[in-house]
Amino acid sequence: MLTVLSPAKRLAARPRLDLPRGLSPTSPRFQNEADELAAVARGLTAADLRRLMHISEPLARLNVARFAEFHEARTAAVPALALFDGDTYAGLEARTLDEDALRWAQDRVCILSGLYGLLRPLDLIQPHRLEMGTRLKTARGVSLYEFWGDRIALALNERATKTGARALINCASAEYFSAVDLEALSLPVISPVFLEEREGERRIVSFWAKRSRGAMARFIAENRLEHPEEILSFRAGGYAFEPDLSTDDRPVFLRTA
């Protein structure tokens, strides 16, 4: 199986990932496209970035500087797993994955990215903020969805062929998974849902759902799961599979608060 994750908005201040001997950082599949997008973003002002991504003035200025130095700062690139530091990656706990799990994840865990399209965990990337939902005008359209088109789906198909994967576990947000052209994708998609029950009401709690998506990716990598039904034994964070609420492509995991 392949597992897809969203990237993180929050980035590590001091990114670090100690790689076992024999494992080395890799280059992004769509580095040329990332360079193309960075060149477009380099022409934007802080006000433009604030408007496009609804971010603060300091964060907008920081990303103006990042895009201005994008090509020159290539030597500062670090593995994606080391840089991303949000709730999903707290659940993944990449720094404590053993060598076998990390090797497995490198081929089968796929990180969606507005700037880089599709990343492997050890792909070298630079600090940036470019959300997939951004309406950034390029020669290919008026949004990043139009820019990426079917290329992310086709890259996932290639990864599936290489690994023998026969299903895709969607642990990404709706914003990011919308960049996967389902008509071009050759894999069935299973999208786990994480619900919390409190005083008889069931709902998605964003913090715990994000963390659980990362924990699910870790569970799959640590146990080298190959079949969708195997994820139903996931128990991290107090969640348990709830068959009465589930369908084949939407397994629901429930916890009681």
UniProtKB/Swiss-Prot annotation:
Question: Which cellular components does GO assign to this protein?
Answer: cytosol
Please state the span of the N-terminal signal peptide per the UniProt entry.
none
Domain of life (superkingdom): Bacteria
**Example GO biological process:** response to hydroperoxide
Against HAMAP family, the record matches this protein to: UPF0246
Similarity annotation: Belongs to the UPF0246 family.
| Name the record gives this protein | UPF0246 protein Rsph17025_0016
What species was this sequence derived from?
Answer: Cereibacter sphaeroides (strain ATCC 17025 / ATH 2.4.3) (Rhodobacter sphaeroides)
